[in-house]
Amino acid sequence: MKPVKATAWNQKTIDEWHAKKGRGVGMWGDHVLLMTARGAKSGEPIVTPLVFGRDGDDYIIVASKGGAPSNPQWLNNLRHSPEVDVEAPSDNGTESFKASAHMVGDRAERDRLFKHMTAIWPSYADYEKRTDRLIPVVLLKRRR
């Protein structure tokens, strides 16, 4: 999918990510990936930079929206169409691959992964306190 749409804030981060080959991006450092998903309404590819962690071969992302009362739009897009393209930092620069998004439904597993992500981005713990919703955790599983 070739991305055709991003917010101005996201575009700045995307441009920086490409210029730095995924390293030292903004305040997030080396933990930013670019996920391209189809818009649920438009069907157009939309690229979103996201903080990520790893769990084995899987990439963990968190639908925090800064602790807002609603989920980010990209989560709705994934629920509509879970097949995505991912660009991520790798040992040899960056890598691109296709993945499937899996919502973590098991509460204990979600809590384990969320705790792992707060070690990478401590603000997630604050975001969780700001909202009444359970912040969703998503695994991006590489398609083979």
Describe the role of every protein-language-model region:
Residues 1-29:
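Extreme N-terminal tail/first-helix region
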Residues 22-24, 41, 124-128:
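Short helix-to-loop capping/linker segments positioned immediately adjacent to catalytic or ligand/cofactor-binding
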Residues 24-25, 51, 76:
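Short secondary-structure boundary/capping segments
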Residues 29-66:
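Short beta-strand segments
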Residues 32, 134-137:
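Short hydrophobic/aromatic beta-strand or adjacent loop that forms the aromatic wall/cage
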Residues 35, 138-143:
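Short beta-strand element of the conserved SAM-dependent methyltransferase core
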Residues 65-124, 130-134, 142-144:
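Short, structured beta-strand-loop surface elements
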